[in-house]
Every structure is written in structure tokens, then in C-alpha cells.
Amino acid sequence: MKTRNFSLVSALYVLLGVPLFVSAASYDDNEFSRKSRAYSELAEKTYDAGEYDVSAEYARLAEDFAQKSSVYIKETMARTTAEDAMNAARTRHAWAKNERIDRAYPTEYLLASEAIKTGGLAFDSKQYDVALTWARKALDALKNVKPESQLLAKAAKEEAARKAAEARKLEEQRIAAQKAQEERKRAEEEAARKAAEARKLEEQRIAAQKAQEERKRAEEEAARKAAEEAARKAEELEKGRVLPAQYKVTTWSIDRECFWNIAKNPAVYGNPFLWKKLYEANKDKIPQSKNPNWVEPETVLVIPSLKGEEREGLYEPNVKYRPLP
């Protein structure tokens, strides 16, 4: 019972931590979260007092209120987001109405109007995600519209530019001659050829420089790895290899392989009485998880760390290993 209550309380604390990372701090201090924290404190106190069943009930209540707090926070944040978007859409729509956007952009204006209306109904019905979608549709509809005065000015400017361009074109056609056109073409072709040659030379230079840099990096990396490997091997020769993290079982008939004898191995634990630690970590790998006396040959066992020591690789019987700390 004590272990079960401790697990419940621990799981509750993890659960209570979730909204703190995903929600605004200002929303977290709500009625549900306050009750959740209060019940959590009661669960801990009653647990410490040895009242494990009472502690479990308080833990359950704390979890229920934590879930309600999470729902409340999500709904509040969704409402705020939707409200901001709807306000932005209404502001943009009011501006469009004042600028008589409906005359130049009747379709966009109508779409925005209907979207705001639909979004408002959804917001009033607490369908905040739907309201947010319609607010964005309204903003998108009016995103690229321009005031009527600006459109008229732009149209006049474009008309003047068009007429000027036509006049220039007629003048160029009048004074242009075939000879000038041919010379211009030759000049353009020559310029294009030289530019292509220059680009090719630059690309070749960059490629050669990049290849040289890559070769240098590869050589440096190879030298670094070789030095590290040499240092590692030298350390292994001096201190012995890092203790193994795995052990492949041989046979009982020849080698007397069992959890007791494996735990006795100096490279494992050097103590046969620690066989249960080895068994607990590997009971899912043996034919009968509740029978530690049956271990099949070729089974690869995991060797858990005993005192925080570093372990890696598969045990090799002919290798010198470092002693346990």
C-alpha cells in the first residue's frame, strides 16, 4: 500500500507540472489549480503520516482538479485569442467601410462582412476555434484592399505611364535602324559570353577551394580520431578497459553459468550475493520470468550499474577490466 500511494503522489506531481509549461502564468492561478495544489499538499501530509488510503484519495482529487484547471486554461486562452482576432477583424472592416472599399472590392468586402458575422455567432456560442478561423478569413479577405482614392491615383499614374511608354516606343521605332539593332545584338551576345566565362572561372575557383578545405578538414578529423583512439588504447592498457554493460551467457553444463556465478565475476559485481540485481534487470529475457535458475545459453544480459560506474560493450573473458569503484 505504501508503494502504491507513493506512485500515485509522484504521478500527480508530474501531471500538475504540465499546465505550467504550456499556459500563461496569469491563467494558472485559478480556482481549480488552487484546489489541486491544496489537495496535493494534503496528500503529501497524510502520506507522511502513514494514512495511505486517505493520501490516495487526496491525490485523486488533486489530479481531477488539475485536469479541470488545464481545460479552463485552454478555454480561456482560446477565448482571448479569438477575441483579439475578432477585434482586429472588426477594426479592419470598419476602416474598409469608411474608405468605401465595397465599391472597388465588393466580393472581398462581402466575404469579410459575412465572416465577421459568422465568427461573432461562433464566439457567442463559445466556439472559439471556429470564431478564430472566421476572423482570419475576414482579415485575409481585406488584406490586400486599398482605399478608393489610392486606386484612382494609381490608375491615373498608370495611364500616364502607359501613354509615355507608347510615345517612347514610337520614337524609338522611328529612329531605330537595322544596323543599330544588329550592333546591339552583337554587343549583348559578347557581354553574355564574357559573363558566362567569368561565372565558370569563379565556380571552378570556389569548387577547388571548397575541395581543398574539405580535404584539410577530413585529414584533421582523421588525425584527431587516430589520436583519440591511441589515447584510449593506451589508457586501457594502463588502467584496464571500462567495465562491460552486457554479458552473453554460455552453458551450465560446462561453465556453470547462472545469475549467482555471473554476479560473482569481478567484471560484473564481484559478489555472488548481488545476483538478484542482475536477475531483476533481465527476468524478461529468461524463459520463465519467475524462475531465476533457468537461463538459456547465448542470452545477452544487461549489467546495471552498481555504484554509478561507467559501463559499455559486451563482456570479453580475455580482456583486463578496471576494478569496481
Swiss-Prot record:
Residues 1-24 form the signal peptide. InterPro entries: Bact_Kbp. EAARKAEE repeats lie at residues 229-236. It comes from the Bacteria. Keywords: Cell outer membrane, Membrane, Repeat, Signal. ARKLEEQRIAAQKAQEERKRAEE repeats lie at residues 167-189, 198-220. Residues 176-224 are annotated as: Disordered. EAARKAAE repeats lie at residues 159-166, 190-197, 221-228. Coiled coil: none annotated. GO terms for cellular component: cell outer membrane. It is a peripheral membrane protein. It is found in: Cell outer membrane. PANTHER family: PHAGE-LIKE ELEMENT PBSX PROTEIN XKDP, POTASSIUM BINDING PROTEIN KBP. Tmp may serve as a porin or transport protein for large molecules. To T.phagedenis TmpB. This is Treponemal membrane protein B. The lineage of its organism: Bacteria, Pseudomonadati, Spirochaetota, Spirochaetia, Spirochaetales. The gene is tmpB.
